UniProtKB/Swiss-Prot annotation:
Entry protein name: Large ribosomal subunit protein uL2
Annotated organism of origin: Pseudomonas putida (strain ATCC 47054 / DSM 6125 / CFBP 8728 / NCIMB 11950 / KT2440)
Keywords from the named record: Ribonucleoprotein, Ribosomal protein, RNA-binding, rRNA-binding
Assembly and binders: Part of the 50S ribosomal subunit. Forms a bridge to the 30S subunit in the 70S ribosome.
Xref: SUPFAM superfamilies: Nucleic acid-binding proteins, Translation proteins SH3-like domain
A GO term for molecular function: structural constituent of ribosome
Disordered: region residues: 28-55, 224-274
Length: 274
């Protein structure tokens, strides 16, 4: 994987920084594992905007990624290829199991075409193998972690993400997440060894607004640039700073206000994130 800084041959190329991976598959995705992906433009069934800054973008197919891997225990799989996935920041790996079935998984860092992976309690401690947390050594780096047994991976799925298993006590294990949060998870839950691929994703620079539009992201307008009818920071004579602590268009505090409201699982958090 290489970081390529483009030459300023035009204003749109001047600030472009690309992440180039020559191992990525250049052809079409595996057809049985793709589905139609319709765009909402950020609107709900009433046609009203419920998510701002969404709309347009290139047509995409959704890749069906296996986040569970619990029904292939003990069946070895060969990595056929590593692919780009427009639906996530991480790359995906196409596995061919010994029984002939093919599935996509989140590609772990260091895994390449031809590698052998396996899931299950007897799987060796090797990047890309999937085990229950009770069978993973303390101190291991993991990703694709379940919060409920059998539900599928929910934590550490984006590019370069990982967590560390730091303790095991009774039916729970303790994880340290990248955010600094330490939380307990049932030892029956599964995780994949290693960290997620494409860790250089954060180093890229799109270089121009149009590249963001290709990805379906619309502009973000500042509140102080609006009229009073549109935003609490709007209006005023000349340029103003908003005149109050930063709030959302609906008046709720932004920039640091705590939004977590799931009291039911508070007892699972040993230490809040930094």
């Amino acid at each position: 994987m290489a970081i390529v800084k483009c030459k300023p041959t035009s204003p749109g190329r001047r600030f472009v920084v690309k992440v180039v991976n020559k191992e990525l598959h250049k052809g079409a995705p595996h057809a049985p594992l793709i589905e139609k992906k319709s765009k909402s433009g950020g609107r709900n069934n009433n046609g009203r905007i419920t998510t701002r800054h969404v709309g347009g973008g290139h047509k995409q197919h959704y890749r069906l990624v296996d986040f569970r891997r619990n029904d292939k225990d003990g069946i070895p799989a060969t990595v056929e290829r590593i692919e780009y996935d427009p639906n996530r920041t991480a790359h995906i790996a196409l596995l061919c199991y010994a029984d002939g079935e093919r599935r996509y998984i989140i590609a772990p860092k260091g895994v390449s075409a031809g590698d052998q992976l396996i899931a299950g309690a007897l799987a060796p401690i090797k990047a890309g193998n999937s085990l229950q947390l009770r069978n993973i050594p303390v101190g291991s780096t993991i990703h694709g972690i379940e919060l409920k047994p059998g539900k599928g991976a929910q934590i550490a799925r984006s590019a370069g993400a990982s967590a560390q298993l730091i303790a095991r006590e009774g039916v729970y294990v303790t994880l340290r997440l990248r955010s600094g949060e330490m939380r307990k998870v049932l030892a029956e839950c599964r995780a994949t060894l290693g960290e997620v691929s494409n860790s250089e994703h954060s180093l890229r620079s799109l270089g121009k607004a149009g590249a963001k539009r290709w990805r379906g992201v619309r502009p973000t307008v500042r509140g102080v640039a609006m009229n009073p009818v549109d935003h609490p920071h709007g209006g005023g004579e000349g340029r103003t700073s908003g005149g109050r602590h930063p709030v959302s268009p609906w008046g709720f505090p932004t920039k640091g206000a705590k939004t977590r409201g799931n009291k039911r699982t508070d007892n699972m958090i040993v230490r809040r994130r930094k």
